């Protein structure tokens, strides 16, 4: 992670120190992706163990670098790490009277064709809707969205992600992926149409 700037130097130790200073076993934390550079579960195990050993209830969202996590294997991961970690994909978790819903998301960064981008974004919207509907079926009507990618592409005033947030009357949209101060304003921050947008990248 040092490639993203000096503040990432010794980032593991910094995160551990700050986490243990602020988080207790009674807290719920959603980590919005990029948990490991590991290409498979064996390679990612050390990083996941690091997270497991931190205090609090930990809910993990899939990031673009999480090669160990195939979306189709989410239930397998939940079974494997039961009581230790919770994996958020095509499902939801509760926090007080809120349903925590989420998906990786997608925005256009110029690395693929528009057609491919639109296909992937539509797939992510479909997955997010599955989360919403699972929560609704369980009786929830208050929602917080978690994404890995920002909810809009640079320059967009809205997107399918902001529209679905309005459709389900969510209170917050929390996302990451944007590293380095030059990228902190890539998408919405603060209140837009009554919804609070928060960038929570590690830096």
Language-model-derived ranges and their functions:
Residues 1-2, 71-74, 112, 185-188:
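Short aromatic-enriched loop/helix-cap "lid" or pocket-rim segments at secondary-structure transitions
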Residues 15-28, 52, 116-185:
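His/acidic metal-ligating clusters that form di-metal
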Residues 32, 62, 101-104, 175, ...:
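Short glycine-rich loop/turn motifs that provide flexible caps or phosphate-binding loops at active sites
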Residues 35-36, 64-66, 105-106, 150-152, ...:
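Catalytic metal-binding/acid-base residues of hydrolase active sites
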Residues 66, 71-157:
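Conserved catalytic scaffold of divalent metal-dependent phosphoesterases
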Residues 175-196, 202-203:
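Acidic, low-complexity terminal tails and accessory targeting/binding regions
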């Amino acid at each position: 992670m040092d490639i993203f700037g000096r503040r990432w130097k010794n980032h593991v130790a910094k995160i551990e120190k700050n986490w243990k200073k602020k988080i207790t076993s009674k807290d719920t934390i959603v980590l919005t992706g990029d948990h490991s550079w590991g290409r498979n579960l064996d390679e990612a195990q050390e990083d996941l163990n690091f997270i497991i050993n931190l205090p609090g209830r930990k809910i993990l969202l899939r990031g673009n670098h999480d090669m160990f996590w195939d979306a189709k294997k989410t239930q397998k991961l939940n079974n494997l790490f039961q009581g230790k970690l919770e994996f958020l994909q095509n499902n939801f978790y509760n926090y007080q009277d809120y349903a925590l819903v989420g998906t990786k998301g997608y925005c256009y960064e110029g690395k693929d064709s528009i057609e491919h981008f639109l296909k992937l974004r539509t797939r992510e919207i479909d997955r997010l809707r599955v989360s919403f509907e699972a929560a609704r079926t369980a009786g929830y009507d208050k929602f917080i969205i978690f994404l890995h990618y920002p909810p809009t592409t640079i320059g967009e005033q809205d997107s399918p992600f902001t529209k679905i947030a309005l459709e389900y009357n969510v209170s917050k949209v929390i996302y990451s992926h944007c590293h380095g101060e030059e990228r902190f304003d890539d998408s919405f921050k603060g209140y837009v149409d009554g919804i609070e947008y928060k960038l929570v990248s590690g830096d």
